[in-house]
């Protein structure tokens, strides 16, 4: 028995010694030190903010919410399976509880987009790589973030507001007026960096014409 305890203690000591090195190889993500080493990678990284736009006009999205609430369309129930827990009826009758799925999906879509823009701006500014289009990427992300925030204040008024990716707490709620004025300044400060004429090389990203269209709607 004594011999068994000695062997067991020896094995435990070996195992404990082997656990002191907690470093690991991560396969599910890319560390910032291993990426953003050239212009191509920074440009590709900015594309993540644009992929968020895909959810705008999907079913049960912010687009659907706005169409329903403005009476531009109506979604009838076709049998019990199409009633969708009454979420469309709630919007049509302007009796919308906080748990309505279109509200939560619209809210999440907006703030996922804002978070992506904040992260990309932070990563781009932090990168030591310098190239001609770097300021343009940052400007595009700021204008796209303004688009998302416009949707937020248009639908909800006062909302949590932050432009700091490193902020760990819950963002402070700001008034619609405060955010509106901030966005107006953000637009004016970044307009000079945007392409004014469409071309094969700038098709898709935020441009001067997009900004003007957004600014017009913003002012309305």
Question: What is each stretch, according to the model?
Answer:
Residues 1-28:
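Bacterial Sec-dependent N-terminal signal peptides
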Residues 18-21, 110-111, 182, 217:
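Long, intrinsically disordered, low-complexity segments
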Residues 23-25, 153-163:
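Short, well-structured active-site flanking segments
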Residues 33, 60-79, 195-208:
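Short, surface-exposed recognition loops and adjoining beta-strand edges that mediate ligand/DNA contacts
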Residues 43-47, 51-56, 82-156, 170-173, ...:
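Conserved, well-structured interaction surfaces
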Residues 209-218:
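Conserved small/polar residues in nucleotide/adenosyl-binding loops
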